[in-house]
Amino acid sequence: MVERKASVERNTLETQVKCSINLDGSGKARFDIGVPFLEHMLDQIARHGLIDLDIECKGDTHIDDHHTVEDVGITLGMAFAQAIGDKKGIFRYGHAYVPLDEALSRVVIDFSGRPGLQMHVPYTRASVGGFDVDLFQEFFQGFVNHALVTLHIDNLRGHNTHHQIETVFKAFGRALRMAITLDERMAGQMPSTKGCL
């Protein structure tokens, strides 16, 4: 089997990001981003997606976290696009529901080649531990635009904002895991009647 790994660097005047991923990993993760709550959420992707993630970022967090969060999403999306390759043999679609106490979220993903994000999370607070939760929209938009996926994210219920967000990221990891899994019955075929994605 071809190794589904990628290492990507993205440098701008605002951030310098390095991202290495292994889609067939065991959930190992290492982060040096400087935004602890984002690192905590990225760890959920690795653990629940069984994806090895190594991400470093030096960003202008002295201004705020916006550029760092968005650019990590962009670079992670670029790494996914590179690692997934031509998409032959993958399940393509993934979905997951994840609860955490009172919170419940659903994530559905399609490695369609068509970027699109529908994200509906009615946060009950504007921040968690000083982190502006609106920035997760920027993270997922950056990921979607560069991984070329269609992504639907819905927090169905919850009143603890930390729980709302954590269920989203856990469900995202689980949905990714389903979508990128190789289907033995596809035997290297493209998962589309068009013959390409």
From Swiss-Prot:
Catalytic activity, EC: 4.2.1.19
CDD domains, sorted: IGPD
Catalyzed reactions per annotation: D-erythro-1-(imidazol-4-yl)glycerol 3-phosphate = 3-(imidazol-4-yl)-2-oxopropyl phosphate + H2O
GO MF assignments: imidazoleglycerol-phosphate dehydratase activity
Gene3D superfamilies attached to this UniProt entry: Imidazole glycerol phosphate dehydratase, domain 1
Main location: cytoplasm
UniProt pathway annotation: Amino-acid biosynthesis; L-histidine biosynthesis; L-histidine from 5-phospho-alpha-D-ribose 1-diphosphate: step 6/9
Location in or out of the cell: Cytoplasm
Record PROSITE patterns: IGP_DEHYDRATASE_1 (PS00954), IGP_DEHYDRATASE_2 (PS00955)
InterPro entries membership: IGPD_sf, ImidazoleglycerolP_deHydtase, ImidazoleglycerP_deHydtase_CS, Ribosomal_Su5_D2-typ_SF
Alphabetized UniProt keyword annotations: Amino-acid biosynthesis, Cytoplasm, Histidine biosynthesis, Lyase
Family the UniProt entry places it in: Belongs to the imidazoleglycerol-phosphate dehydratase family.
Record protein name field: Imidazoleglycerol-phosphate dehydratase
Origin species: Pseudomonas putida (strain ATCC 47054 / DSM 6125 / CFBP 8728 / NCIMB 11950 / KT2440)
